[in-house]
């Protein structure tokens, strides 16, 4: 096992990365190795998908499958070895279908790629786990050096985050052939184990550029399906009655669940990154979507254990449900998986509903406590003139974008301290589950109007923040980096990595990121990123605030 993709990975004087029987996330060495094998198969699939396009051959099923299967290897998504093997087998099936189709117009097609003809050596978990060791991500680490190894992983993990957003968009009916060509190009290239540092940095930024287009496509999918988010208050206290909790990012799953539970006397609560759902008109109209429950994903083992109903995981982040003894009432769907947990197919939530009706539900209604969400792209852009007026009047001095992934490190209290300590003439734009560090605090308003805390949505709604910045830049006639706006990113996994690469690709400089640096990037690479882009780590809220304001 060698896995170094998330913030909680092991960091020791002997080396970084989880490399024993189980990762810090709970992923076994077996599953981790099989994920490496799956990735190798996906490299091969992408290489042949590109070759097929030279002949005008497009297999849309293969295109859709490729990023979805890659998403399954993202942190805290799929821990089920059998499911991972199934994805690898399907990747080879699609690859062979492409080769067959190409052969009809180009007999005995040739492809110069090291993984062009990879085959699975066996069908059992043990056989494939043994083969998987050949494809560990650190096999040539000593040969190429830490810098090249780290930036190659930066590109791979960034592409993994972009693959997740491609899948989220596809679920909502959004598909762009040109973006899939770009995706396959990057995936095939990474399968060649590139080792030129400058090329790796350039490609990493190119992956970020691609992801900006992916986020735009996802934004269109969400707003066309559910309407533009509008500011809305959300109750964060329990309501008496039977209940279902839904977590993850897939708003379509929530819509299906709301339709199937309507009129059944079951209250539905959002958790984690589902919180922004309460701002979408086509979701908030359901009266039995009663509120939000819990906090950041890392607290789920305690909070899910206390939740008296059924639980649905639609995407990341999932952790061991056996610890809190709720494995019999949690369900997975889409690419999520945990051994022994019931997996739902085709949006059939009947087992969830049945379990919810069996459970006790909340015995009484607690005193209501509301927070506000719904500051999506359109709302933010519509407010841009008001923001400019406040800036010109000296009533708004700075906007801080504070968001990203949450996690369980004590150092993450930094984000709470920073947000709460900011002067009253500043505003905080937040997104991602990092918001749970401070989104239940009262920040008040500026000049009696603009809320000081603006929740823009999920991590992919970084797009909304970017479009606000672009709009302000255009209206003020200044560059993005001249705006009184700073970004303090909270990273944990690969979606945050691709968000960072997207920002850097757009030319956004002086981003702060923490609470710690990625374990796969050494000090030399971090210094390089600081020199080229002004990327900085965190110190203390007071020191960083002073540095930002005085720049």
From Swiss-Prot:
InterPro entries: HCP/CODH (IPR004137), Hydroxylam_reduct (IPR010048), Prismane-like_a/b-sand (IPR016099), Prismane-like_sf (IPR011254), Prismane_a-bundle (IPR016100). Keywords: 2Fe-2S, Cytoplasm, Iron, Iron-sulfur, Metal-binding, Oxidoreductase. It is an enzyme of class 1 (oxidoreductase). This is Hydroxylamine reductase. Belongs to the HCP family. It comes from Actinobacillus pleuropneumoniae serotype 5b (strain L20). It comes from the Bacteria. It catalyses: A + NH4(+) + H2O = hydroxylamine + AH2 + H(+).
């Amino acid at each position: 096992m060698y896995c170094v993709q998330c913030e909680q990975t092991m960091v020791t004087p002997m080396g970084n990365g989880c490399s024993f029987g189980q990762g810090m996330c709970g992923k076994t060495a077996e599953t981790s190795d099989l994920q490496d094998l799956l990735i190798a198969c996906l490299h091969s699939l992408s290489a042949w998908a590109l070759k097929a396009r030279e002949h005008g051959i497009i297999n849309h099923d293969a295109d859709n499958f490729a990023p979805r299967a890659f998403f399954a290897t993202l942190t805290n998504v799929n821990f089920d070895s059998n499911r991972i093997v199934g994805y690898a087998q399907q990747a080879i099936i699609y690859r062979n279908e492409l080769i067959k189709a190409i052969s009809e117009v180009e007999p005995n097609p040739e492809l110069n790629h090291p993984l062009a003809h990879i085959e699975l050596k066996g069908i059992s978990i043990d056989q494939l786990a043994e083969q998987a060791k050949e494809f560990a991500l650190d096999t040539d680490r000593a040969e190429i050096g830490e810098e090249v190894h780290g930036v190659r992983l930066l590109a791979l993990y960034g592409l993994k985050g972009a693959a997740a957003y491609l899948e989220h968009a596809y679920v909502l009916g959004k598909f762009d052939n040109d973006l899939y060509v770009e995706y396959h190009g990057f995936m095939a290239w990474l399968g060649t184990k590139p080792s030129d540092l400058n090329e790796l940095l350039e490609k990493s930024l190119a992956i970020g550029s691609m992801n900006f287009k992916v986020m735009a496509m996802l934004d269109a999918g969400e707003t066309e399906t559910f309407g533009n988010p509008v500011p809305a208050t959300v109750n964060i206290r329990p309501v008496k009655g039977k209940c279902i909790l839904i977590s993850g990012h897939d708003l379509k799953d929530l819509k299906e669940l709301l339709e199937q539970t309507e009129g059944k006397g079951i209250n539905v609560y959002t958790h984690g990154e589902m919180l922004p759902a309460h701002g979408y008109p086509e979701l908030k109209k359901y009266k039995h979507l009663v509120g939000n429950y819990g906090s950041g994903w890392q607290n789920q083992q305690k909070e899910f254990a206390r939740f008296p109903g059924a639980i649905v995981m639609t995407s990341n982040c999932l952790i061991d449900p056996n610890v809190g003894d709720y494995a019999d009432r949690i369900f997975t769907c889409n690419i999520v998986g945990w051994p022994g947990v019931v997996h739902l197919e085709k949006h059939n939530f009947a087992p969830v509903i049945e379990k919810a009706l069996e459970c006790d539900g909340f015995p009484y209604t607690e005193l209501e406590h509301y927070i506000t969400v719904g500051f999506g792209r359109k709302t933010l852009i519509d407010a841009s003139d008001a923001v400019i007026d406040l800036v010109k009047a000296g009533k708004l001095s700075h906007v801080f974008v504070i968001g990203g992934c949450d996690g369980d490190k004590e150092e993450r209290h930094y984000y709470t301290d920073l947000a709460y300590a900011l002067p009253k003439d500043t505003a905080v734009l937040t997104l991602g589950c990092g918001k749970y560090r401070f989104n239940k605090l009262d920040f008040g308003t500026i000049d009696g109007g603009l809320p000081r805390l603006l929740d823009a949505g999920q991590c992919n709604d970084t797009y909304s923040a970017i479009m606000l910045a672009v709009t302000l830049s255009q209206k003020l006639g200044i560059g993005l980096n001249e705006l009184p706006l700073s970004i303090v990113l909270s990273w944990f996994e690969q979606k945050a990595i691709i968000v960072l690469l997207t920002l850097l690709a757009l030319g956004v400089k002086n981003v702060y990121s923490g609470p710690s640096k990625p374990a796969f990037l050494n000090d030399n690479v971090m210094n390089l990123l600081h020199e080229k882009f002004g990327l900085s780590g965190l110190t203390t809220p007071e020191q960083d605030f002073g540095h930002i304001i005085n720049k």
